[in-house]
Regions:
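Non-catalytic, hydrophobic alpha-helical segments
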Residues: 10, 14, 30, 41, ...
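Amphipathic terminal alpha-helices
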Residues: 91-118
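Glycine/proline-rich active-site loop of Rossmann-fold NAD(P)-dependent oxidoreductases
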Residues: 2, 7-8, 12, 16-29, ...
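PAPS/PAP-binding and catalytic site of the sulfotransferase fold
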Residues: 37-49, 94-98
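C-terminal "lid/loop" region of Rossmann-like NAD(P)-dependent oxidoreductases
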Residues: 25-28, 39-42, 50-71, 76, ...
Length: 118
């Protein structure tokens, strides 16, 4: 499982930490606090895009078990205690906003797939 943040929530978290008093040197998570599997994420994207997909696992892409963190979910307790930050975007809202962004031809023309996907 993973814990995904929408980028606007992450940026708001950075700003909240930067503005907070007495947090220098603190390790502070910015997380949604919600676990989701990769399959659930893919199925939600397919639903948003109204796409019919087949789930295929490529054995070449499976990481060795000793190199993988199988469950990853952030704890927001510290950021919520030290700042007024709370996540505002659900996973579905963030995915919908992302899909909508990519559906806009003007945005897609600016997307540098050869730079971002190395």
């Amino acid at each position: 499982t993973r814990d995904f943040n929408f980028v606007k929530d992450t940026c708001r978290g950075f700003l909240a930490i930067a503005r907070a008093e007495g947090v220098e040197g603190e390790e502070i998570n910015i997380a949604s606090g919600t676990e989701v599997t990769m399959k659930q994420t893919l199925m939600k994207i397919a639903e948003i895009m109204d796409a019919d997909i087949n789930w295929v696992v490529d054995p070449e892409r499976i990481r060795p078990s000793k190199s993988e963190v199988f469950r990853l979910c952030g704890d927001n307790t510290k950021i919520e205690t030290l700042t007024d930050w709370r996540p505002e975007w659900s996973l579905e809202e963030g995915l919908r906003a992302t899909v909508d962004w990519f559906r806009n031809p003007d945005n897609l023309a600016k997307y540098k797939y050869n730079v971002y996907n190395r």
